[in-house]
Each structure stands twice: as structure tokens, then as C-alpha cells.
Amino acid sequence: MAIKKCSLRTMYGDYPSADYFKDFLHKIYPCKEPFELLVVDKKPKTRAGVYIYDAHRIRIYAPWGHLKETAIHEYAHHIHYTECGSKAHGERPHGPQFWEIYGALMCVAVQKGLYVEERIEKNAKF
């Protein structure tokens, strides 16, 4: 199944929709717990995205760019929180277990051709 690119027109430009990102993330790993995903037309000073644990909600702040990478990062927080049990609840948000999950998701995304880092692709000499 191909990922449909539905755009979201914002004051900063066109971005893929929340449904696009949910499909993208489920292709990498179909998580066990449902979550809400919002693409927000806002640019906070310090973050490109946020995972709100108690609401199982991912927010991606579109103007920052790197949307797929941000979506995977916040999805890793969701998986860490919902699938690693009480052990994850006491751990730092960016502890070793989180980075293991994030790294695994990124590897799968690259292997499936869903994520290509532009800096790597641009500099590759094949």
C-alpha cells in the first residue's frame, strides 16, 4: 500500500497530513496502543515535536522541518511509554531504552525505503 501524500496548507507552507504520518509510522512498526497525531502550524522556540504521555498524543510542529525524523522520534516515546511497562514510566524520557527503540525504528524506516536522510543522499557517491 502506497502512502498517500495529503497536504496540509499552513501559513508556513504545505505539509503532509496527520493521516499521512500515522500511515508512515504504522508501516515502520504497528504499535499496540492507539495514539493521536497532530501536525501543528506553530513554531515553538525549542522543540520540533512533543509526545504527551497521558493523552497518547504526538504533536509535530511543521515549521521546524525534518518532519519524518520528528515523527519517528515522538513515536518512539509512544512505544516506549505504552509497550515497555512500568519500567519505562520511571526512566528518563531520553534514557537508554528510548534510544534503543528510536534507533530500531530509524533502521527499519531506512531498510524499507521510507526514510532517506537528505544529507546522506546528497553526499553519497555511488
Regions found by a protein language model. Name each.
Residues T70, E74-T82:
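Catalytic glutamate of the conserved HExxH
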Residues D19, G65-H66, P96, E100:
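A structural signal for well-ordered alpha-helical segments within the folded catalytic domains
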